[in-house]
Amino acid sequence: MSCCGGNCGCGSGCKCVGCGGCKMYPDLSFSGETTTTETLVLGVAPAMNSQFEASGETFVAENDACKCGSDCKCNPCTCK
């Protein structure tokens, strides 16, 4: 069964999650079986001030350099 009807997207840790991603279609076979649909709700929260802003820690976006490739697996390429 393909993830999100083939529209998988990369999430945190370069794991394939969600829909509306890179539009890869790893599984185009139809067997007539009943499938279960999952819904992933993503949201945006307001920025929060923190007393640790100047602590010297650096944060890197986990999804910066990956995209969903064949078989809904993440590849280390940027999806544009």
Curated annotation (Swiss-Prot):
Keywords from the UniProt entry: Metal-binding, Metal-thiolate cluster
Highest rank taxon of the organism: Eukaryota
Q: Name one GO molecular function term.
A: metal ion binding
PANTHER family xrefs: METALLOTHIONEIN-LIKE PROTEIN 2A (PTHR33543), METALLOTHIONEIN-LIKE PROTEIN 2B (PTHR33543:SF33)
Family per similarity comment: Belongs to the metallothionein superfamily. Type 15 family.
- Protein name as catalogued: Metallothionein-like protein type 2, MT2-4/MT2-25
InterPro entries for this protein: Metalthion_15p
What job does this protein perform? Answer: Metallothioneins have a high content of cysteine residues that bind various heavy metals.
Chaperone as a keyword of this entry, yes or no, is: no
